Amino acid sequence: MHCPFCSENDTKVIDSRLVADGHQVRRRRQCLACNERFTTFETAELLMPKVIKSNGNREPFNEDKMVGGIQRALEKRPVSADAIELAISMIKSKLRATGEREVPSKMIGNLVMEQLKDLDKVAYIRFASVYRSFEDIREFGEEIARLED
């Protein structure tokens, strides 16, 4: 790694520690030319797969779009911010775990519904009604009946 002070190539690691619950490594380094010390942080680069829309278009995964849908479904529901954040993290982990470069938008919707079903049944029905385009009250009733089984 280049020294930020003198741009020398030769630096050595003095100390390494895990930080951020083991998701990041903090390293103290010393330049062998000017003896200045500096800190670096190392994290894994985790790329999200691209999304294949129902019309066949491909676009980058948009976390804000997913979070917005989840938050709308959970609006005025007694679910903590921590629980919501954990659900979002689990969805993203499952998407990365597929190992695919592209995933269908339907998969993301199903993962969201799976998490909402565990978080709050009312939020699940709200999301499902939009996601599955419920046309009438009968479809709501059928989905509620499936929840009760």
From Swiss-Prot:
Cofactor(s) this protein requires: Zn(2+)
Keywords tagged on the record: ATP-binding, DNA-binding, Metal-binding, Nucleotide-binding, Repressor, Transcription, Transcription regulation, Zinc, Zinc-finger
A GO biological process held by the record: negative regulation of DNA-templated transcription
Zinc finger (unnamed): 3-34
InterPro entries, per the entry: ATP-cone_dom (IPR005144), NrdR-like_N (IPR055173), RNR_NrdR-like (IPR003796)
GO molecular function: ATP binding; DNA binding; zinc ion binding
Family: Belongs to the NrdR family.
Role summary: Negatively regulates transcription of bacterial ribonucleotide reductase nrd genes and operons by binding to NrdR-boxes.
Protein name from the UniProt record: Transcriptional repressor NrdR
Organism: Vibrio vulnificus (strain CMCP6)
